[in-house]
Amino acid sequence: MPSNAHRPDVPAARPDSPASGSPGSVSPAGPASAVGPTIDLNADLGEGLGPWSMGDDDAMLEIVTTANIACGGHAGDPSTMRRALASARARDVAVTAHVAYPDLTGFGRRFVDMSPQDLTDTLIAQIGALSALAAAEGTAVRGVKPHGALYNAIAHHEGHARAVVDALSTPAHTSLPLVAAPGAIVAGLAEDAGIPVVLEAFADRGYRPDGTLVPRREPDAVITDEHAIVDRVLMLAVDGQVRAADGTLVPVRAQSICLHGDTPGAVHLAGVVRSALEHEGITLRSAV
């Protein structure tokens, strides 16, 4: 279990916290089931490239339960990947392959109009590269989470959603769960193909009333207020809902919550979030 080294003081408990096993609790998709509400905290890590680095991976790995490691699409060279894998293994943190469009220049935040077959092939290569390095470190990739523009596109782009499912349907990857947004086309296609799906929500992203994320180019796309983020995470973990940018309460069934590790104060904020969840009696455990 990650240590408490980076966790600040715990916020006050919510008076409306449910008892263990209440209807508001969220059950993860992992292999074992804990008593009471359980949630996974994941972060995107290993997003450096050569001499350039992003975020404090080691500090985040003391807090999160799953690390999504970039594997060459938007970031991540072999040495960066292997260092991140070694750090995750040392802290007993589960690893997913953070696959992306082949877009190093745009950090994977631009849609790439490529054929589904080409996309499938590049995703197989990315997962394979991280898996090979994981094996060299005596560990294994336990899931796949798309990044950036790919994550957003496969919520509605059926061709690219099927390409992701095809990549996970190859013999080498059939046991890997897919991390996806609730209601995304890719989630339904993956379930139809027999691929386990872990549903995810975001601690610091704005939501629309329909449950989709507010695009980054629009106001209210990113939440920066610490108290608002803690309230968001507790509402997700306990009540299974979020408050949209217009104030609407939106049902969001999530087994994992993403904490971005590349924003200012990310480590402090992640520690506050983890402490708040533990103070509410919520078990932190990987969902992959």
Spans of model-derived segments:
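Intrinsically disordered, low-complexity terminal tails and inter-domain linkers enriched
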Residues: 1-37
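Conserved, mostly hydrophobic/aromatic
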Residues: 44, 98, 144, 259
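Glycine/small-residue-rich loop that forms an oxyanion/phosphate-binding "nest" at active or ligand-binding sites
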Residues: 103-146
